């Protein structure tokens, strides 16, 4: 079974890309797809671009053109869980949009019309991620809610609004829920793996620039170990 891996930026895919054997590159609509073998497994590594629309386009193309059996999203995020620090990892239990508001029509905050309020990650992939995390003892990993919006949470006021609306949110970023929605509509299992590059609302733009390489590396380490453990 082929495994799809999606990252938004060069920094988030470059480590895994460097490890691909027999790599073939395809570019469609600005999205970059790298087919190859990672530790004996067939993978399609995808660089989507940043934000929800870019992620949705890339995920749709990935599923339509390359037909992976499961999808793993790797990358960085802003932290909300108070027990976490930069470099720690969140494995998604479910994913929601934090910048959607159709409550005037009776939907939950974050719920898009005619869709579920949350997109649950695949239980088998969560289990595989947790088992992989247990073998990487130098990385702290938790499971939790990841929320998505086209906002970089540098503004403490905006960060606090998101915290109020989603009090159990562990991390916040800009692609995961779009990837999750496409996987939900295609009925393809997914899991999101995000390492913290910053803490939302606390000069996070400065932290992001400094710690993105660390976050990208840590997420890539876990994703590679997950793939090693998948049948």
Swiss-Prot record:
<dbReference type="GO" id="GO:0019284">
    <property type="term" value="P:L-methionine salvage from S-adenosylmethionine"/>
</dbReference>
<protein>
    <recommendedName>
        <fullName>5'-methylthioadenosine/S-adenosylhomocysteine nucleosidase</fullName>
        <ecNumber>3.2.2.9</ecNumber>
    </recommendedName>
</protein>
<dbReference type="GO" id="GO:0008930">
    <property type="term" value="F:methylthioadenosine nucleosidase activity"/>
</dbReference>
<feature type="active site" description="Proton donor">
    <location>
        <position position="198"/>
    </location>
</feature>
<dbReference type="InterPro" id="IPR000845">
    <property type="entry name" value="Nucleoside_phosphorylase_d"/>
</dbReference>
<comment type="similarity">
    <text>Belongs to the PNP/UDP phosphorylase family. MtnN subfamily.</text>
</comment>
<dbReference type="InterPro" id="IPR010049">
    <property type="entry name" value="MTA_SAH_Nsdase"/>
</dbReference>
<dbReference type="GO" id="GO:0009164">
    <property type="term" value="P:nucleoside catabolic process"/>
</dbReference>
<feature type="active site" description="Proton acceptor">
    <location>
        <position position="12"/>
    </location>
</feature>
<dbReference type="InterPro" id="IPR035994">
    <property type="entry name" value="Nucleoside_phosphorylase_sf"/>
</dbReference>
<dbReference type="Pfam" id="PF01048">
    <property type="entry name" value="PNP_UDP_1"/>
</dbReference>
<dbReference type="GO" id="GO:0005829">
    <property type="term" value="C:cytosol"/>
</dbReference>
<dbReference type="GO" id="GO:0019509">
    <property type="term" value="P:L-methionine salvage from methylthioadenosine"/>
</dbReference>
<comment type="function">
    <text>Catalyzes the irreversible cleavage of the glycosidic bond in both 5'-methylthioadenosine (MTA) and S-adenosylhomocysteine (SAH/AdoHcy) to adenine and the corresponding thioribose, 5'-methylthioribose and S-ribosylhomocysteine, respectively. Also cleaves 5'-deoxyadenosine, a toxic by-product of radical S-adenosylmethionine (SAM) enzymes, into 5-deoxyribose and adenine.</text>
</comment>
<feature type="binding site">
    <location>
        <begin position="174"/>
        <end position="175"/>
    </location>
    <ligand>
        <name>substrate</name>
    </ligand>
</feature>
<feature type="binding site">
    <location>
        <position position="78"/>
    </location>
    <ligand>
        <name>substrate</name>
    </ligand>
</feature>
<feature type="binding site">
    <location>
        <position position="153"/>
    </location>
    <ligand>
        <name>substrate</name>
    </ligand>
</feature>
<comment type="pathway">
    <text>Amino-acid biosynthesis; L-methionine biosynthesis via salvage pathway; S-methyl-5-thio-alpha-D-ribose 1-phosphate from S-methyl-5'-thioadenosine (hydrolase route): step 1/2.</text>
</comment>
<dbReference type="GO" id="GO:0008782">
    <property type="term" value="F:adenosylhomocysteine nucleosidase activity"/>
</dbReference>
<keyword id="KW-0378">Hydrolase</keyword>
<keyword id="KW-0028">Amino-acid biosynthesis</keyword>
<keyword id="KW-0486">Methionine biosynthesis</keyword>
